[in-house]
């Protein structure tokens, strides 16, 4: 019992430490660089303290619940602040803190010339805090607060360079697409309020209501918006307009992971609902294939990595769809390490090449930037699921489990194709950015000797190598794993990965010196992201916006300012003038007619 009592105490201590730098900004004006180091140190201490309850949980396997502040009671709906410290939250929190610590240290180098770097660090810290609120929440209200918190912080961080039109547009896209998902989340909250009169997870899961398809569809819509699934995905590659540390934090352990994590939280309701499982599986399979196709022909290094994130999120949705939430969570944790490392490495290249992001203008960087090149190679191999790197311990079991789900053959097939494409575009990054001859200006000064650049990448390299083994060794399977399977199924994940590597290498070598005369339709489809942004952001809104503009500026003005008043007055005046102008104004003729009439009348009277 003493061990269990230590878990909530230490975890709350780490959360309180994170809030201290925010409180200092309210008490005094932090114009010096001390705030940066205070914030980084606070995250480091919080990470060190959070490791203790995680290790205690691994030893005792006892969950802890904290309910320490009652807010209000509305009729019989009790609203309180409560935390759920179980396997998911206690495992994810140290990982998020470790990655944020590395990203903040990297930001000291990457953002050193920004005049508002103190505010930038505060936003990063708030981004982390809202994600930890979401992860540790034990009720829907607290979960919704964290949900909206990561949304607003992503808006502020994506639009950090608000002088750029593209950055503002990308932030608005992220906000609007997430508002669509929030409609589903609010619908789910309303359904549970009406039918269960409770937002506490324990009561919802113990009640286990029937016919939960409607609220779970709302949850799936919310997760699709937050985790950039097909249909609500265009904001994710656009979000690359933000600073690289923002992209690293957003893609590794905060914003996009919130949707998948929420689905994992609600798996007790989903595991017996075949409609939701099938919908999740199909949505994830379509997403992972579509975004992998789009990543194959992109030239922006950050967009390639961003689309790979969306593809991996689709793979996590596939895993949830085949009723393996623990596997999806393990992949979420392992993915965080190498994805953060890939973004930091790309930021190192971009910063050293004077903001050049086109991989066609790189090359030969393995000589001038060996540490960054090593990180990109290890991260790309881990992303593809190369054996004994971090990604292997989650990706290989996912493919094995999917192979055993024989009723979902088409979803398995396109998932395998997407896994092979992952190896292809990862090889393409290595081939164009690191190998060959330099294609950047010869006077470019390349330097990676700064410890704020090198140390975070080194830490993430170690995480990308060893953390998959450590996490998988301390995870209890949700269901009984398949004990036997044919050898060709066992090696399927490795086979499709090697196939992708081989095809990408051969194609790159064959086409390196060829002129690209005219792109094919498939190439254009991939480069234009499946024409989805063009269709949804231009073709469909254009008629309605044009009609609205004409209605507001032309038709309304034409009616009120032209037809109703001036033309009506003109018509009235013309009518009156026509009535008056029947008399021609011939006075002599009128007077003569008058005299003749009087004379004739007098003669007749006499």
UniProtKB/Swiss-Prot annotation:
InterPro entries: NADH_DH_su5_C (IPR010934), NADHpl_OxRdtase_5_subgr (IPR018393), ND/Mrp_TM (IPR001750), NU5C-like (IPR003945), Proton_antipo_N (IPR001516). GO terms for biological process: electron transport coupled proton transport; mitochondrial electron transport, NADH to ubiquinone; mitochondrial respiratory chain complex I assembly. One of its GO terms (molecular function) is NADH dehydrogenase (ubiquinone) activity. The chain crosses the membrane at residues 3-23, 38-58, 87-107, 124-144, 180-200, 216-236, 244-264, 276-296, 304-323, 328-350, 369-389, 404-424, 460-480, 483-503, 586-606. Its main location: mitochondrion. GO terms for cellular component: mitochondrial inner membrane; respiratory chain complex I. It is found in: Mitochondrion inner membrane. Coiled coil: none annotated. Keywords: Electron transport, Membrane, Mitochondrion, Mitochondrion inner membrane, NAD, Respiratory chain, Translocase, Transmembrane, Transmembrane helix, Transport, Ubiquinone. It catalyses: a ubiquinone + NADH + 5 H(+)(in) = a ubiquinol + NAD(+) + 4 H(+)(out). It is a multi-pass membrane protein. Its EC number is 7.1.1.2. Pfam families: NADH5_C (PF06455), Proton_antipo_M (PF00361), Proton_antipo_N (PF00662). It is an enzyme of class 7 (translocase). Belongs to the complex I subunit 5 family. NCBIfam families: NDH_I_L. Core subunit of respiratory chain NADH dehydrogenase (Complex I) which is composed of 45 different subunits. Core subunit of the mitochondrial membrane respiratory chain NADH dehydrogenase (Complex I) which catalyzes electron transfer from NADH through the respiratory chain, using ubiquinone as an electron acceptor. Essential for the catalytic activity and assembly of complex I. This is NADH-ubiquinone oxidoreductase chain 5. It comes from Loxodonta africana (African elephant). The gene is MT-ND5.
